[in-house]
Amino acid sequence: MYAGTCGETMICAGGTNFPDKPMLEGGAKTWTDRIFTLSPGENGWTEAGTLPAPYAYGASASTREGLLCIGGCGKEGHRKDVYLLSTADGAVTVTPFPPLPIALAYTAAAVLDGKVYLTGGCERPREQDCTNRMFMLDARQPDRGWQELAPLPGRGRFLHQMAAADGVLYVLGGIGLRERDGKQARELLTEAWSFTPECGWTRLPEMPYAIAAAPTPTPVSRNGVIYLLGGDDGSGKKYTPQTNPGFNNQSLCLDTAAMEWHDAGPIAAPRAVLPCCAWQGRFAAVNGELKPGRRSPEVWSITLS
């Protein structure tokens, strides 16, 4: 799904679930176009409109103008569409924005100085390939459209994490594809990269272990520490779908001043494949998967020093 903010209002939109019965029992995936909002002081979510079509698995970016829902996919395939969701007097306005140059799902975005940067993702369904391309849109001047920038020097990836801290963008982990026995096989990545518009890409120390699909854009503390909360560390491979206990319940942090990785301890609500946004002095992680095919309706938040 997509989630972010417009002013003091949190907006959630789109997504998928299995409403009738679980995926492992043959349940059919359902796509939704519904939009919900939550404002300070309210006790619950308000349904506030619909997307132009049911979408999911795109990137979310909170800008001064509102929440950008970028790319993703629907039943018909991967999408180039970009929409701005803004709020006024409790209503949500959906405004078409310049489309992506290519269709992308399972991509990631972060905002730096009013500009939205998008990296990676899959161009076609069924994970046939993934890209290392990078695009940028100035949300204050959307008529200029998306500009392609220097690609990530590392592997193409999807379900990776992005963050922006102190004028620097970070691309962390994710999933790459490698041919194995004539087929494309998933490979979790420990690569970490930073990017500045002035200096381009820089390789960072390897992550202690691979993480994909953690809440993104990832939370960043006031002193520039980036947190990867939960996500998929690949440990579920040793279980059957029926015995899978759920996703990684540990967290990692990157101290961007010392450029060092550290364990950050266990988390209460491990999830994967979910958006995250700053809201009311906290970081909110919205819905996501408890384990493959099992969705959560919960929203959890964390306060960072």
Show the residue positions of the predicted features.
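Kelch-like beta-propeller repeat domains
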Residues: 1-305
